[in-house]
From Swiss-Prot:
Name of encoding gene: Tim17b1
Pfam families recorded: Tim17
Residues making up the signal peptide according to the UniProt record: none
Described function: Essential component of the TIM23 complex, a complex that mediates the translocation of transit peptide-containing proteins across the mitochondrial inner membrane.
Family, similarity comment: Belongs to the Tim17/Tim22/Tim23 family.
Name of the protein in its database record: Probable mitochondrial import inner membrane translocase subunit Tim17 1
Keywords, sorted A to Z: Membrane, Mitochondrion, Mitochondrion inner membrane, Protein transport, Translocation, Transmembrane, Transmembrane helix, Transport
Single GO biological process annotation from the record: protein insertion into mitochondrial inner membrane
The keyword Transmembrane belongs to this UniProt entry's keyword annotation: yes
Organism: Drosophila melanogaster (Fruit fly)
PANTHER family reported in the protein's UniProt record: AT05822P-RELATED, MITOCHONDRIAL IMPORT INNER MEMBRANE TRANSLOCASE SUBUNIT TIM-17
Membrane topology note: Multi-pass membrane protein
UniProt keyword Membrane, yes or no: yes
Compartment(s): Mitochondrion inner membrane
Amino acid sequence: MAEYGREPCPFRIVEDCGGAFAMGALGGGAFQAIKGFRNAPSGLGYRLSGGLAAVRARSGLVGGNFAVWGATFSAIDCSLVYFRKKEDPWNAIISGATTGGILAARTGLTSMLSSALVGGALLALIEGVGIVVSHYSADSYRQVSPVERQQRYKQELLRQQKGVSPLAATYGEIDSSAL
């Protein structure tokens, strides 16, 4: 599907780890800047320095956590591609569930299972939305032959000459006795 433009698996792990670190550091930096700004003493200088101090203290840590998640997810995804010999949405769903479980393993079995469930559900939602979007956007990029384009144009002209709206032409006339 959309994975064909990506790097091969050993490099994909490093690429995903770096991308996840960048996302975590930037997103965590913005969040920590707001948090540090709000929690600093009053005065613009104190608030700006408080926001900057919070960014320096925590954004690297958040980026590191994201990098661990990205590397674990990508390593599991590459392993599944190798063993299953196919690259499909199930790999991402299984990788998300397994990553959630592995990263929560230190907190106990219940937390591990719930994190695995959340990771799998989250990746299933992401993959599902990606499939739906690609399905509906693929039709708009479908090539139309000149003959088919001419036929559609003639049908549209006939509809306009009859005075039938495009909605009625698509769904048919409404039977008023059924109302």
